[in-house]
Amino acid sequence: MTQLRNVGGSPFWSWYGFGSRCCFLLSRSGVLAYTGLKVETNTEYTPQGLEMILGRYAFQCRIDEKAFVHGRGHRKTREQRYYEKLKEYTEKLKEYVKKIWICGPERNSYSKTDHDATFMRMKKDYMGNDQLLPAYNIQIGAADEYIAVIDVKQYRSDMDCFVPLMEKFRELYGFYPKYPVADAGYGSYNNYIYCQEHGMEKYMKFPMYKKETKEKEYHENPFRAVNFKPGPDGTLICPWGKKFRFAYRKAVKGNRYGRQEEYYTCEDCGGCPYKEQCKKPDKNRMVCVNRELSCMYQEVVENLESIHGALLRMNRSIQAEGTFGIIKYDRWYKRVVRRKLKRVSLEIYLVSIGHNLYKFRNKRKRAAIAA
């Protein structure tokens, strides 16, 4: 597999997987030995390193590109073949370095017509055909029918947009919101810990919130690891009475707070009468447990299912969803006309200002009529 990575934070990039092909070219018996050129083969290469090898090879073999032959009836020399192949690898690596630099460390795609845009799945793809289009992730925070804070991000996931939006809110108003209510796209371990650290209550749904609260069969399913009974010795007891013993602990990739998940393996699934309902593979079942995250989920459910939480959820649906509804369907603004992140941000800010002025005028008009 071919991958690129940054070497020690420097402007040099190495190419994994590329080394297998380049090593084959450079270390073949007799390929460069007859020239007297000694080249150290590696599993990783940089464009600068390949250019140096290419230059040394051209100097050693006295290569003149003007004398190269092409087309039918012409037989390339061994030096020309190896030189062109090495040059092809060098140019390809430069191309990949440029593309990965444009992408940056926080995304894995970009549009050729707008390098700041990221390919995302659109809501209008009703049939789920995996239609990916270049887009930006627009985030708003609504209060009293006004757009209080707005942010434009390149992240595909809403979870990654929560912290920057809250920091922007604090930058504007000098404090964090007490009850940041959000839909299931924002509830994650990172965001819950962030709320704890900054004095915010956990009122963001998690991805399985609806299923957890509305489907009794799923919530009370005895074969879910969270419903296993804890044993006195730290094990988990399945419905058949078998013990799940601790196997290992694994860090979650990309988690900024050092979140870890524990894996437990059943001592013996042989002869289990619930095998078809409990597991699919033939080997003993292994489950993943994160007790801290499960406690957070329980706290979120208690918050949102309370009367106060129900009122906050209703208010969010009216204000946040209503704001997008007015902008997209009443004003027919469904697509940005500018490119580049700064220009798109400017356009969204102007639309938001227009929305707030519209709301302000309506409120004054209603107040005047009521008076």
Predicted regions span which residues?
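Alpha/beta catalytic cores of group-transfer enzymes, especially the acyltransferase/condensing modules
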Residues: 10
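Tryptophan (W) side chains
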Residues: 13-15
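Cysteine-centered motifs
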Residues: 22-23
